[in-house]
Amino acid sequence: MKIKVCGITRLEDAAMVTELGASIVGVVLDELSPRHASHNTIREIAEAGITVAGVYTSEQTVLSSPLFEDYVQLHFDHDPELIRSIHELGRKVISVINFNGIRDLKIKYNAYREADIILVEYKKGVSSIVSQIAPLGLNVGYAGGISDRDIENIIAAKPSIIDVSSSLESSPGIKHPGKVMSFFKKIRDAMDYVS
């Protein structure tokens, strides 16, 4: 299972979470987000050898991006053609589905199946719906309200990736070392327990 830590705004936080076990760090490029960072932040992280995802909220911002990142995370409704176009540019794709019921989820899952990772997000807490989404596929991950309190339930569902952000912060965009260390320890403990 991979772990993505999102909302990264500084190289030092990207390095810290990677050293502790994150597989991917996410940089939000939406200027309206309190966790907004720039393409230069992505480039700096990528040049440090850290796997990074740029998080986009519109197709227009993807198409105008220099794409310094390893993964392009599409946090908006999109079609399979955009996924293919990004693959043609040599980048991997994370397609996000905001959970709005199982029927909608299955429709979007089928539309996004060419993505490298399909991330199901549920802001109210994805752990409350894992039983509904666990059977979807091998490339499905979870996001939304994940913290060290529900990590055993999440890991037991065997997602390909989990995505965490605000539960590891001291303030928006700034990761708290103690919270990060505690979270990764809980993950290791839960994985030992589940396996």
UniProtKB/Swiss-Prot annotation:
Name listed for the protein in its UniProt record: N-(5'-phosphoribosyl)anthranilate isomerase
PANTHER family, sorted = N-(5'-PHOSPHORIBOSYL)ANTHRANILATE ISOMERASE (PTHR42894:SF1)
* GO molecular function (one): phosphoribosylanthranilate isomerase activity
Asked whether the keyword Isomerase is assigned, the reply is yes
InterPro entries, A to Z:
Aldolase_TIM (IPR013785), PRAI_dom (IPR001240), RibuloseP-bd_barrel (IPR011060), TrpF_fam (IPR044643)
Q: What Enzyme Commission number(s) apply to this enzyme?
A: 5.3.1.24
Listed NCBIfam families? PRK01222.2-2
Q: What is catalyzed by this enzyme?
A: N-(5-phospho-beta-D-ribosyl)anthranilate = 1-(2-carboxyphenylamino)-1-deoxy-D-ribulose 5-phosphate
Q: Which Pfam families does the entry mention? A: PRAI
Instruction: Decide whether keyword Nucleotide-binding is in the record.
Output: no
Alphabetic keyword roster: Amino-acid biosynthesis, Aromatic amino acid biosynthesis, Isomerase, Tryptophan biosynthesis
Output the superkingdom of the source species: Archaea
* GO annotation, biological process: L-tryptophan biosynthetic process
Species annotation: Thermoplasma volcanium (strain ATCC 51530 / DSM 4299 / JCM 9571 / NBRC 15438 / GSS1)
